[in-house]
Amino acid sequence: RGVDLSPYAWVDDMQAMAERSDVDVVLELVGGSDGPALTLARAALDAGKGFVTANKAMIAHHGLALAEQAALRNAPLKFEAAVAGGIPVVKGLREGAAANRIERIYGILNGTCNYILSEMEQTGADFGDMLRAAQEKGFAEADPTFDVEGVDAAHKLAILAAIGFGARV
């Protein structure tokens, strides 16, 4: 890789790592709504560590409980990249919700579907052709199931609804 990783401690026990006194913030890159990612989140927050993730599935399914746990331990829980990674929509929504009554949320929740549907409408091409084109251009994953079946958009919508309206979706 060209990067010397020898100075860094490697662990295979997430619980122990989250409890280490020399760890202030835990960054989760595991993925999945349950299992190791959730175990790590709970362990880090229980230990009062800051926790950062872009894991939209975990935040959609367990975000409210994790937020309560974080508040009890006065530990930061950050997940801005879980929704519209390049746009600070979570921060904006939190700040807007604190000062205003939010009535609606509009937006494109899934870029893959937006590309496919827009191209289908403009060119008349069929879904399969546009999905392959999206994959070739890097807009769609090799396994686009979560995108084209709406799971990705549902996760994002659940997060936005929880922040904007206090709703469990």
Name every feature range the model reports, one short phrase each.
Residues V11, R20, G35-L38, A60, ...:
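Electropositive phosphate-/nucleotide-binding environments in soluble metabolic enzymes
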Residues A99-V169:
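Active-site-lining helix/loop region of Rossmann-like oxidoreductase modules
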Residues L5-S6, S21-D24, A47-G48, L72-A75, ...:
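Short coil/turn connectors at secondary-structure junctions
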Residues G32-A47, A54-E95:
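Rossmann-fold NAD(P)-binding glycine/threonine-rich loop
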Residues V11-D12, E19, L27-E28, V52-A54, ...:
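General beta-strand structural signal in soluble alpha/beta enzymes
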